[in-house]
């Protein structure tokens, strides 16, 4: 009269739990600097790319900060990003063409299973733009009159561009100076510009007018982000009547 207990266990007697580590995050911040002009909020646009694909687009804050959103990682691995500025349409701005490379290495602690993201930023994290100031230049010609005294405003002269368009019309002063106004050149006008200065033929009886077409060349060059204008005047800058 003895009882006997027989246990029947399942084939699997082990409870298996899976630990899923919490995602880790990484965030990048760059700066924008503008020289020659006050920086304003949202003036410039920046892109964050991974594998050549744009994943975020941001604009600068008023203080120049460029803050990208945090990126989450739920597994180990290495990630490479590029940050670049989107070139704008303002021809008076020299935009920074830097491609800043950021790497993120995500590792997992063997004991705790916790993920950690290590961010490696480039040495240069500042995008530098330059507002290129226009350059101005001017020149004078002279008028000489033989046979009598020259009067103020007596003769008229025109400054024409290479297409023959009249840009300025001026008269001489009593001393014979023909003073033209400033010519202004912007960042988009680097190069060579040609002009002519001509006397407008009058109708005074007995007056012999000078038919000279004086050629003027202005060469606009750029040293870094500074414009320079160089005038090349003809050997003869005097109109003789």
Task: Describe the residue ranges of each PLM region.
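Solvent-exposed loop/turn and edge beta-strand elements of beta-rich ligand-binding domains
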Residues: 1-241
């Amino acid at each position: 009269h003895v009882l006997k207990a027989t246990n029947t266990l399942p084939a699997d007697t082990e409870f298996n739990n899976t630990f899923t580590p919490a995602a880790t995050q990484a965030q990048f911040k760059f700066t924008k600097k503008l020289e020659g002009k006050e920086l304003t909020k949202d003036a410039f646009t920046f892109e964050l790319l991974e594998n050549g694909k744009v994943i975020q687009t941001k604009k600068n804050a008023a203080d120049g900060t460029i803050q990208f959103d945090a990126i989450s990682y739920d597994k180990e691995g290495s990630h490479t990003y590029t940050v670049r500025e989107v070139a704008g349409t303002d021809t008076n701005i020299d935009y920074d063409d830097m491609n800043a490379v950021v790497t993120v290495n995500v590792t997992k602690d063997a004991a705790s299973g916790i993920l950690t993201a290590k961010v490696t930023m480039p040495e240069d994290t500042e995008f530098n733009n330059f507002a290129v100031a226009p350059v101005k230049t001017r020149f004078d010609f002279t008028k000489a009159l033989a046979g009598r005294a020259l009067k103020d405003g007596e003769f008229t002269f025109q400054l024409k561009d290479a297409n023959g368009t009249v840009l300025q019309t001026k008269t001489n002063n009593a001393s014979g100076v023909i003073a033209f106004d400033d010519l202004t050149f912007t960042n988009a006008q680097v190069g060579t510009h040609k002009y002519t200065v001509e006397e407008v033929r009058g109708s005074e009886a007995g007056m012999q007018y000078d038919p000279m077409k004086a050629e003027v060349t202005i060469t606009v060059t750029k040293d870094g982000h500074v414009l320079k204008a160089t005038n090349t005047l003809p050997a003869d800058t005097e109109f003789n009547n």
